[in-house]
């Protein structure tokens, strides 16, 4: 299945969010795919009988920017430089993770740095460059990541435009980024809780 929609920033620039879901894949098999006119990529499905995953926390692309959010050229330049530096380090980390034979990654949250509250004008798209940096490493074309909502992700619907999660529930939904979700890998159940919704009874 496939679905897409558009959001706009304060200048009227449009951003597309496209999500695709495929089913019926065989285990331990290489598949090839292509997005628009980009180069062909591949991924290999895992062996669910025995697998390895990496647990990471706070990639927080853009966090090396020491300037507070302001609608100034200085802030945007500092943000751009921070994203470049943080994305490089994130990419190097992912290469090491993949070289260890990892099947997928579980992220504890805070994929990016700039919250909507601290963005210039409370813009929901200021973090777009940070998400672009987070998703830029070539490794992520073939290495799946299961993300969790962190406090830097939670106040901005922009988070949910970048990740396609399975079995999404309205339980734990804080009204912006969706609720809890789960998936199984082999005989293991992974339950991903949106802990930014503090109603513990819902989870």
List each model region and its residues.
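Active-site glycine-centered loops adjacent to acidic/histidine catalytic or metal-binding residues
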Residues: 58, 109-110, 150-151
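Well-ordered alpha-helical segments embedded in enzymatic catalytic cores
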Residues: 89-96, 133
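Extended active-site neighborhood of metal-dependent phosphoesterases/phosphodiesterases
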Residues: 12-21, 30-42, 74-78, 119-203
């Amino acid at each position: 299945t496939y679905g897409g929609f558009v959001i706009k920033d304060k200048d009227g620039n449009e951003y597309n969010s496209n999500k695709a879901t495929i089913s019926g894949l065989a285990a331990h098999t290489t598949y090839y795919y292509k997005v628009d006119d980009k180069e062909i990529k591949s991924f290999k499905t895992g062996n669910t009988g025995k697998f390895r995953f990496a647990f990471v926390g706070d990639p927080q692309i853009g966090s090396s920017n020491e300037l507070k959010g302001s609608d100034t050229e200085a802030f945007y330049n500092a943000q751009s430089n921070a994203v470049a530096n943080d994305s490089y380090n994130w990419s190097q980390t992912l290469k090491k993770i993949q070289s260890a034979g990892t099947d997928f990654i579980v992220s504890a949250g805070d994929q990016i740095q700039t919250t909507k509250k601290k963005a210039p004008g409370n813009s929901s798209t200021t973090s777009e460059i940070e998400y672009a940096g987070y998703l830029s490493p070539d490794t992520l074309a073939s290495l799946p990541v299961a993300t969790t909502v962190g406090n830097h992700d939670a106040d901005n619907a922009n988070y949910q435009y970048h990740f396609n999660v399975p079995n999404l529930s309205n339980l734990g939904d804080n009204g912006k980024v969706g609720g809890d979700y789960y998936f199984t890998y082999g005989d293991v159940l992974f339950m991903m809780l949106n802990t930014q919704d503090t109603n513990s009874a819902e989870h």
